Amino acid sequence: MTKLQEMVTFRDVAVVFSEEELGLLDAAQRKLYHDVMLENFRNLLAVGCQSPNKMAPLDTTGIRCLPLGQLPCWQMTSHDVNKLARAPEDGINTPGKGPHLLEQCHSSCHWGAEQPSQAPEDDGCLENLPSNHSSSSDNQEFLSGRAQSSWSKAHFSERWNHEKHCPQTLVKTKSQLLAPGVNILGCISHHDHNILHKRDKVPSSGDCDQVIFPMTLLTQHCVYREQKAYQCSRGQEVFSDSPSLELHQQTLLGKKSPVHSTHKDTRHSPSVPIQPSVHPGRKRYWCHECGKGFRQSSALQTHQRVHTGEKPYRCDSCGKGFSRSSDLNIHRRVHTGEKPYKCEVCGKGFTQWAHLQAHERIHTGEKPYKCGDCGKRFSCSSNLHTHQRVHTEEKPYECNECGKRFSLSGNLDIHQRVHTGEKPYKCEECGKGFSSASSFQSHQRVHTGEKPFHCSVCGKNFSRSSHFLDHQRIHTGEKPYRCEVCGKRFPWSLSLHSHQSVHTGKKPYKCGECGKGFSHASSLQAHHSVHTGEKPFKCNVCQKQFSKTSNLQAHQRVHTGEKPYKCDTCGKAFSQKSSLQVHQRIHTGEKPFKCEECGKEFRWSVGLSSHQRVHTGEKPYTCQQCGKGFSQASYFHMHQRVHTI
């Protein structure tokens, strides 16, 4: 066991909340705060005991009576407390009458010239106890209910008022002793004092004006900073005190509280190690790189590896390095297959407690993490952080090959396979390879025919979730994709990309046969059927075939008689949207097709094509009977009637 390395004052262990913070605490948290501060002050005495073999000699009862103290409580150091413990050997004599141990914190505690110019931030004086209080059983309710509430409120006020004297009388005469069973500053109560006097045959409390201090308990409370006796039941972490363990367990459970720990009196329980009650939220060690604070120097040293990149812990199986031994222990479970954390609902195992905690929310439906921008909720904090990049447009992961950036590291890994050509996912049915697991899973449904995504509106099923989401916009009318040039909106990104070529004139997809350009790959594929003569889309009614699905759909309306496109001016209906657009020019008088030779204008492109033959002399329609040629099909049909008469 190691000795104390430095003096400890109450300022070092006290924690003070502002008035605003105190207002946020409920009754239970205020009581907890009171208990924490009280326990901290009690254990300040324990800090002063050095080590057991250096304690002052004990009397036959094992109890040392403490004399009058001279310092205010906030100035008490371990040295001062130790001096009080050895008082009889130092020649300090406590009279049989009047006040004793620290009778006044400093009865005229004005902040004068001999005092600090400013009150300490961490005040810890106790409020005056009722002067009429005695040790009788009639006063069992002392420090309970409203009295305790007002006492704790005054006890932990935000800061000292320099115009007030210190309200504390730590321990007064026997007529003003603490309530039975209440231990302050490590002193036993008057009630316990009586018991000890009777048990050990020492003068009764009526003959003794001193508050006695059990030095055996003081010895138990000595601080051994390197001792670690509290181990987490869910992992291998070990802590030097129970508050730190409790704080760690609350972190695992995702709990947060303004008061960081609870303190239970374990002085009389031999099975639980006695540890100091220094508040676990105290941070004494600070990182010079980023300013982050830590309660232990070892935690700071571990954190600094984030900045240095040091990874001293290596996996024997794969050679991967880690900055913390706990991370290495968790990683080893990847190789061993160990999954110590089991879901009680479905039995699924996990390598980490945090993963189990996140999984359990699937069963409970809990989503505690809420996006402040859009209100969307998530079951995992990591999912929330990832989602927030949608709003911030942050893309921290950059491809070294092409410079493209991604919001997720997983998406970057998948993208890099475009450059490497890696396709680790192989289909056993057809041998096709895929760069991502999601693409592979979607492909497998081609063979199985599975369509797990069902539209509740029209009943249509889809094999891919992306296709299902795109389809739903038909019913909702949602158009999330907006053209920045003209403001037109589209339900699908593909439609927006096709539209943007109207403004840019860009047609990146070229036909290898005729050189014609297209703005979209699907348009080029449809055009290829012109050269190949392929017509893969067949009408089930008349068996007519078409090169495009849109042409087949328009044709099928011939059989159904459906005419969904209606003219708002005259009410005439059409089976095709293009036919409606041409018809509307009759009402508007629009003639968009103009002859470059003579300037004549036409409503339809077919009219312009027929007219241009007047200038070119082209006569594509030839009579097989007499060989006469015609520039228009209508003239050709009229001529054929001459031969049939």
Swiss-Prot record:
Keyword Repeat applies: yes
Keyword hit for Transmembrane: no
C2H2-type Zn finger ranges: 285-307, 313-335, 341-363, 369-391, 397-419, 425-447, 453-475, 481-503, 509-531, 537-559, 565-587, 593-615, 621-643
InterPro entries documented for this protein: KRAB, KRAB_dom_sf, Znf_C2H2_sf, Znf_C2H2_type
Domain KRAB residues, every copy: 8-86
Biased composition regions of type Polar residues, renumbered to the chain: 129-144
UniProt keyword terms in alphabetical order: DNA-binding, Metal-binding, Nucleus, Repeat, Transcription, Transcription regulation, Zinc, Zinc-finger
Domain of life: Eukaryota
Biological process (GO), any one: regulation of DNA-templated transcription
Disordered: annotated segments: 112-144, 255-280
CDD domains linked: KRAB_A-box
GO molecular function, one term: zinc ion binding
Protein family per UniProt: Belongs to the krueppel C2H2-type zinc-finger protein family.
Protein name: Zinc finger protein 235
Organism: Mus musculus
Gene (name only): Znf235
